[in-house]
UniProtKB/Swiss-Prot annotation:
Posttranslational modification: Under oxidizing conditions two disulfide bonds are formed involving the reactive cysteines. Under reducing conditions zinc is bound to the reactive cysteines and the protein is inactive.
NCBIfam families according to UniProt: PRK00114.1
Gene Ontology MF terms: protein folding chaperone; unfolded protein binding
GO terms under biological process: protein refolding
InterPro entries in the cross-refs: Heat_shock_Hsp33 (IPR000397), Heat_shock_Hsp33_C (IPR016154), Heat_shock_Hsp33_N (IPR016153), Hsp33_helix_hairpin_bin_dom_sf (IPR023212)
Protein name per the record: 33 kDa chaperonin
Amino acid sequence: MTNQQDYTQDNDKLYRYLFQHRAVRGEWVRLNKTFTDTLNTHQYPKAVQDLLGEMMVATNLLTATLKFAGNITVQIQGDGPLRLALVNGNDQQQIRALARVDGNITENMSLHNMIGKGVLVITIAPKEGERYQGVISLDKPTITECLEDYFVRSEQLQTQLIIRTGEYEGKPVAAGMLLQIMPDGSGTPEDFEHLTTLAATVKDEELFGLPAEELLYRLYHEETVNLYPAQDVQFFCGCSAERSSSALLLISDEEIDEILAEHKGSIDMQCECCGTHYFFNKEAIEKLKSTRV
């Protein structure tokens, strides 16, 4: 059995790998503290926690395919009790997530019952250049299957996603793998099918509890796999007092004064993503107003 020191060395890491004799590329990611930090800010129902974990892993795997600096947003909108689930991640593997719930969500509620009539939207935003947005119908039982379909339709590349959420040693964990035929056309369907068949045998405890190198050896011990250095993954919200101040400046002085009157002379702004509070008293508000152009 792998000891704790061994398995934790790859907590909150993303790896890329290539098969030396088959034109297929792969990625592996595991979210431990990153996932826990996300869940600690809200009391989400269990089914929503699992969905966010699945979306976070998918977003990490998607951003790892970017060939440029930028970010990807994976967003679900619907008219069911889960109104919104949103994950944003960038090429530095900094990620954040949030959900909005309006209604009762049971532990084993299906994706379709949670969302109702809804869509999955993927937005790719390079730091330089135009944004790309794809809208995907939620016509599959899981987000993972919907995203596999997205890859086939948008990139015309055979892609396998394996994503699992759960607990390991009593703590929340989300992990996943991506296999994709190389875009240069050198890969064969037979090679891809062979590797995906092996990947499909992976067990939850292996994804959650093994270092990447050992996991890949167990799955592909007859293959030559080139494993590249890991990239750290972390929860990163990006909120700040400055951004909260800018948000306040978007409303009129009259509206600000009304809010101050209703809240006994101060405004408490809470970040929806990480839960951080930003307090503005009357003096700070007056100073802020004076900066208006």
